[in-house]
Amino acid sequence: MRLLLIHSDYIEYEAKKKTKMAEEGAVLSDREEDALTVFTAVESVDEEDTEGVILQAIEEVKKTAGQVHAEKIVIYPYAHLSSDLARPELAVPALNALRDGLAAEGFAVKRAPFGWYKSFKISCKGHPLSELSKTIVPGEEGEVVSKKLGKKEATHDWFVMTPDGKTHDYHKYLDNTPFGCLVKKELGVAEPTGGEPAHVDLMRSKELVDYEPASDVGCMRWMPKGKLIRDLMADYVLALLLPYGATPVETPVMYDLGDKAIYEHADKFGERQYRFKSNNRDMMLRFAACFGMFSIMRDMHISKNTLPMKMYELSTYSFRHEQKGEVIGLKRLRCFTMPDMHSLCTDMPEAMKCFEEQLAIGWQTGRDFETKLVAAFRCTKKFYDENEAWVKKIVKESDCPMLIEILSERVHYWEAKIDLAAIDGQNRPIENPTVQIDVESSTRFNIKYFKDDGTPVYPPILHCSPTGSVERVICAILENISTQKVPALPTWLSPVQARVVPVAERHTAYAQEICDALNAQGIRCDLDERDESVGKKVREAGMDWVPYVIVIGDEEMASKKLTVTIRRKSEPNKPFKEQMTTDALAATIKNETAGKPFRPLYTPRKLSLKARYI
């Protein structure tokens, strides 16, 4: 922000002609005597910390007014102070906030209109402090925190609701159960924990994911085994949502902040954003798939009989400029993959019905990923008062206690939402699935359908991520595994589902036949034909968390039955072994992974050909 402060005998102006960005309802001519005139230019860089810039400007003007003993202030928008001006959508609220902030300090404040060609006359007093210029610069470049200028502050009430519909003081739940850990974190009473989360070591030691030093902090590189898990999760969500009626789309990762709807939605979100210049356009990298899907919906011809309409995108990638010190492992990233569904509903009752369906999908993903989920439901007081019976219904159907947060008024785009979270090894929540009822975006983005009489309706929109970001799901799975006596991935997500270990070279050909037969039946199976001891091969299979390990020796070749170590039935130092045929083993694994997606091996079938990545 640029300021030119003139201590004036008088300032008078008259608005002559509108520009295309002229504000309406302003005072078009005025005069003030013995005032501090503040010629002001709001710059594009001020978007990085608008609130901070305004607070600094208030202090600078207040300081100068005190030095020259001025009690009256005139704020005069003056574009000629800068060659890099902010958009009107930012500049006008910033000028109003500057005016209101100075008025709150006890000054008599006037503001000249924005976006008009004006004539003005000014008489400078001519003393040493009568002409001063100030440049106010925001914080770190590239990191934008939406300040939601002019937003209302809400009060928050908290309680716990149990499936019987009763409400309870949340203090009774401040324990170390998974739900208690969520309550403590949300209420700000969680004990501080130190050290690195368990999943960080596991993601690297198992050669799944690693940091990419040549990229920005919080951007990861995916090795073949991690890439396979990630792809299977994407397949899983698509297979889950297609039968539900979701229609897949793909949209850009960057958007023009000159679009008023996009700017307002970004500002509502309130998270750090990547913003940059493309020629003279202010752009941002998306933090979710809302922008692209809403743009598609805005251009569609929607009739009531096509609702509810569900649109899905695997947002690869989304971006949030998290603080460097907060970025860690897969839990908090700057670049991530988000399964994102938006449902356009006829009205609020239909939105609430879809909410129930999508919440059920969220709970199902927790079971399929073998992660224990706990819940926090949030809504406005108005929504709760009107729909208390429905809130009790979803708690009952979820069959678990929920932390309930009641906001005195709406400060976000949603009227109600639910967040499901896993708990990590340090008793901290990992937010994953979410469902939200958005009551603002259809109006903001001009998304509508028409009644039979031609009346337009701007309907509620549900935001749903049935899993949360893929990275956080993997984080939750690894954190859960870190607490197990015998760590094991869900078999359908295991990069290698079975491994064949020949005892000696003479057993290798038969072991190869078994390996090929299992792969032919849709089992990810590899062969450890290396010249190593059987003990070492079996130990390494355990370190790789292979669910089924088949040792082939003379007995197995003669009997045509396999000796299989089953990881999920084993205990520390007590491997569980079972004899079965090749077809029986394949049937066991297929039964265990029924209904889940399958992809073949992403690594060589022979261990002697596998490279080390970390």
Curated annotation (Swiss-Prot):
Cofactor: Zn(2+)
Region of interest (Catalytic), ranges: 198-490
Cofactor: how and how many bound: Binds 1 zinc ion per subunit.
Compartments reported by the entry: Cytoplasm
GO MF, one example: threonine-tRNA ligase activity
Top-tier EC class: ligase
PROSITE patterns to which the protein is assigned, alphabetical: AA_TRNA_LIGASE_II
Keyword terms: Aminoacyl-tRNA synthetase, ATP-binding, Cytoplasm, Ligase, Metal-binding, Nucleotide-binding, Protein biosynthesis, RNA-binding, tRNA-binding, Zinc
The keyword Repeat is annotated on this UniProt entry: no
GO CC, alphabetical: cytoplasm
Any one biological process term the GO annotation gives: threonyl-tRNA aminoacylation
Recorded catalytic activity of this chain's protein: tRNA(Thr) + L-threonine + ATP = L-threonyl-tRNA(Thr) + AMP + diphosphate + H(+)
Region (Editing domain): 1-141
Amino acids binding Zn(2+): C290, H342, H463
Quaternary data: Homodimer.
Domain note: The N-terminal domain is an archaea-specific tRNA-editing domain that hydrolyzes incorrectly charged L-seryl-tRNA(Thr). Catalysis of tRNA editing is performed by the charged tRNA itself.
Family the UniProt entry places it in: Belongs to the class-II aminoacyl-tRNA synthetase family.
Record function comment: Catalyzes the attachment of threonine to tRNA(Thr) in a two-step reaction: L-threonine is first activated by ATP to form Thr-AMP and then transferred to the acceptor end of tRNA(Thr). Also edits incorrectly charged L-seryl-tRNA(Thr).
PANTHER family per record: THREONINE--TRNA LIGASE, CHLOROPLASTIC_MITOCHONDRIAL 2 (PTHR11451:SF44), THREONINE-TRNA LIGASE (PTHR11451)
NCBIfam families: PRK03991.1, thrS
Protein's name in the database: Threonine--tRNA ligase
